[in-house]
């Protein structure tokens, strides 16, 4: 039960504390070497929300809803920054369903970058597979929604994606994505 991970005295809380300690040890090595890192923890928390028999999402950190998720995020943030003194971290909140991102957003004080995962190549073969035809749209409605979510205070990234929007479409649609991270080899190696 994820709700127990934010309750002191529970085995889930103790386990999460150990996980954060292990993570902090590794991040400390990077801080000692003056290496900044974009950390995208607890990503896609609302992924597939409500589509399982118990109404939960596909990752454990989202399985008890937005309020518990935000508590978990803030616990992670506070522990790493205040208890362990890690200040080389750029915190990235990664939405899955942008339509309800505001419900899950941990808040401007705990986030540096907002991000979205885009998988929307054209699936137009009879077998349901991608034809390889990339969707070059800049998906500006999603970009604009995430930009407005933070009142323009945060940069907006495409943290996972298949095809990359065309430069022309990003200019036309005024969608200034901070970066892209193609997730599959097909999209890394194709034009």
Regions found by a protein language model. Give the residues of each.
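Aromatic- and acid-rich polysaccharide-binding/catalytic face
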Residues: 101-131, 181-185
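Alpha-helical scaffolding within the catalytic cores
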Residues: 25, 94-106, 137-145, 162-171
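Loop/turn elements at helix/coil->beta-strand transitions in domains of secreted/extracellular proteins
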Residues: 32-38, 82-90, 109-112, 151-156, ...
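P-loop/Walker A phosphate-binding loop and immediately adjacent motor/lid segment at beta-alpha junctions
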Residues: 126-162, 191
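Substrate-binding cleft of secreted/luminal carbohydrate-active enzymes
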Residues: 153-191
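Aromatic-lined carbohydrate-recognition surfaces of secreted/lumenal glycan-active proteins
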Residues: 40-43, 73-100, 153-164
């Amino acid at each position: 039960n994820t709700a127990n991970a934010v309750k002191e005295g529970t085995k889930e809380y103790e386990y999460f504390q150990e996980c954060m300690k292990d993570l902090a040890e590794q991040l400390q090595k990077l801080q000692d070497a003056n290496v900044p890192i974009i950390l995208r923890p607890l990503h896609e928390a609302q992924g597939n929300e409500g589509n399982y028999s118990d109404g939960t999402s596909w990752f454990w950190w989202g399985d008890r809803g937005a309020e518990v998720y935000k508590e978990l995020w803030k616990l992670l943030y506070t522990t790493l920054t205040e208890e362990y003194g890690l200040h080389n971290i750029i915190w990235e909140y990664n939405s899955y369903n942008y339509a309800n991102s505001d419900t899950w957003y941990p808040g401007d004080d705990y986030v540096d970058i907002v991000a979205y995962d885009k998988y929307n190549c054209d699936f137009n073969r009879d077998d349901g597979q991608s034809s390889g035809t990339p969707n070059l749209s800049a998906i500006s409605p999603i970009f604009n929604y995430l930009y407005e979510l933070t009142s323009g205070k945060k940069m907006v990234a495409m943290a996972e994606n298949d095809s990359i929007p065309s430069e022309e479409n990003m200019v036309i649609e005024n969608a200034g994505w901070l970066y892209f991270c193609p997730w599959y080899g097909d999209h890394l190696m194709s034009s």
